[in-house]
Amino acid sequence: MSDFEDNVPDDLEGRGYEEREEEGLDSFDSSVRIEISRLSLFTHHGVTDAEQEAGQRLVFDIAFEVEDCDATVTDRVEDTVDYGAVCQAVALIATERSYRTLERLCTAVADMIEERFRAANVIVRATKPEPPIPLPVEEVSVEVER
């Protein structure tokens, strides 16, 4: 046994997944917050037709909660949300059609994450690193919360 294991109090030892299943306990009542930072995609969104045709890079920051996340105990990927699948789904929404506003795009992404991944407290931020504004602006962002 390691020094760490020797110092763990007995009352911190948890029951395993199998023991909880035998007792009829379906979940571990543990929620987790998942954050995806700086997902960069080339898209065709914008107010003007020219902006949509030329396309531009958008950067997404996404956060959401997964209620009753059994993976906190089971360590099984199938007991949580696959982050890669979330990124692929966001990429599909962001590239399959054009939106005039970032507000609508962020809403579409947030709605999809809520529905497809059964997530709660979803926050989606889309950032235009080089907005077509004739003033010295580094970036613009829109954030939608669900």
What are these regions (language model features)?
Residues 2-146:
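N-terminal, polar/charged subdomain of small-to-medium soluble alpha/beta proteins
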